Regions:
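Short loop/turn segments at strand-loop or loop-helix junctions that form parts
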Residues: 93-94, 132
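Long, charge-dense tracts
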Residues: 52, 59-87, 119
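Short, thiol/selenol-centered motifs that function as redox-active sites or metal-ligating centers
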Residues: 89-92, 242
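Long, mid-chain structured domain cores
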Residues: 71-81, 96-109
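Primarily the internal scaffold of c-type cytochrome electron-transfer domains
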Residues: 1-59, 102-124, 128-129, 133-244, ...
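Long, structured ligand/cofactor-binding scaffold of large enzymes
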Residues: 86-89, 96
Length: 270
C-alpha cells in the first residue's frame, strides 16, 4: 500500500485513518465490541460453530490482518497443515490475495489451510484491492464476484463507473459460503438477492453452515449481505453507490478527491 503514497497522498492519508477506533453508534462504528458479551444467547444459538467462540463488531480496513489473526475463530495453527479454517478466510483481507491466487491458482489458494499462507498475507486491505495499479481504474480483483455475475448471465466488465463504486465493495461485503471440499468461495446469488432466493439456493444444494451441537439441526448463518440489501433498497433503486456515502468527495487545496477513510456515514454528519 505504501507505494501509492507519493502519487496519491490525500487518498493514502485518509486510508490510514481507517486505523482509528474512536466512533460508536447504535449501528456499529469502528470500535471492536464483544457481541457475545453483549448477547450471550448467541453463544447458545451458534453452539458448534466458530462464532460461538468469538464475535466482535468490525474495525477499519487497516486492522484486517490483525483482527483475523487475533480472533479465536481461526485458532492457533502451529503448522501449515494445522488449524480449523481454510485459507479461503484470507480472501477479503489483503491485496496479497490476488498475488497469491495468480501464483498458485485460485483452486489451490482456497483448498489449503489458513495457516499455510500466513507468511504471505501481510498487507491489510488497501489500494490494489479496488484499483488497477497501472491506471488506478476501479477493478474487480476477486474471482467470486465475477463468477457470480457469470452464473446470472451478466458481464461485469459492462458495469458503469457508478456501478463500479459499489461493485468493488461487493467483492467482500456480501453473503457467501465455502463450496465443497475445496472450500471454493461462492456467492449464492443464482436465484436472486432475497433471503428466500438464497434459502432456495442452499436447499437445492443441500448446504448448511453447521449442525447445532444441542438440537442437531442443520443451520444456515448469514454473513454480511450488505451489497444485496443495498441493491434491493431505496439506495440501489436510485443508483446511489456505496462510495457516495461511505467515501464522500472532499476538497483540499483546490483538489477534489474521494475520502478513503471508509467508515459509517454517521461519523461524517456535520
Amino acid at each position: 500500500n505504501e507505494v501509492f503514497k507519493s502519487d496519491f497522498p490525500r487518498e493514502y492519508q485518509t486510508w490510514t485513518e481507517t486505523a482509528k477506533t474512536d466512533f460508536q453508534s447504535e449501528f456499529n462504528g469502528n470500535v471492536a465490541v464483544d457481541v457475545l458479551e453483549q448477547r450471550p444467547e448467541m453463544v447458545v444459538l451458534w453452539a458448534g460453530y466458530a462464532f460461538s467462540k468469538d464475535y466482535s463488531t468490525p474495525r477499519g480496513h487497516m486492522h484486517a490482518i490483525e483482527d483475523i489473526t487475533a480472533t479465536l475463530r481461526t485458532g492457533a495453527p502451529a503448522t501449515a497443515t494445522d488449524g480449523p479454517q481454510p485459507s479461503t478466510c484470507w480472501t477479503c483481507k489483503s491485496p496479497d490475495v490476488p498475488r497469491m491466487m495468480e501464483a498458485i491458482g485460485v483452486d489451490a489458494f482456497y483448498n489449503n489451510k489458513w495457516g499455510a499462507l500466513g507468511d504471505e498475507i501481510v498487507n491489510p486491505i488497501g489500494c490494489a484491492d479496488c484499483h488497477e495499479p497501472e491506471n488506478m481504474n476501479l477493478h474487480i480483483s476477486r474471482p467470486a464476484l465475477i463468477e457470480a455475475f457469470e452464473r446470472q448471465g451478466k458481464d461485469i466488465t459492462k458495469a458503469t463507473p457508478q456501478e463500479m463504486r459499489s461493485l468493488v465493495c461487493a467483492q467482500c461485503h456480501v453473503e457467501y459460503y465455502f463450496k465443497g471440499d475445496g472450500k471454493y468461495l461462492t456467492f449464492p446469488w443464482d436465484k436472486g438477492f432475497t433471503v428466500e432466493d438464497m434459502e432456495a439456493y442452499y436447499d437445492e444444494a443441500g448446504f448448511y453452515d453447521y449442525i447445532h451441537k444441542l438440537s442437531r439441526t442443520p443451520i444456515l448463518k448469514a454473513q454480511h449481505p450488505d451489497f444485496e440489501i443495498a441493491q434491493m433498497g431505496i439506495h440501489g433503486q436510485r443508483g446511489v453507490s456505496c462510495a457516495d456515502c461511505h467515501m464522500p468527495y472532499k476538497s483540499e487545496g483546490g483538489v477534489k478527491f474521494s475520502d478513503h477513510h471508509i467508515q459509517s456515514p454517521l461519523a461524517m454528519i456535520d
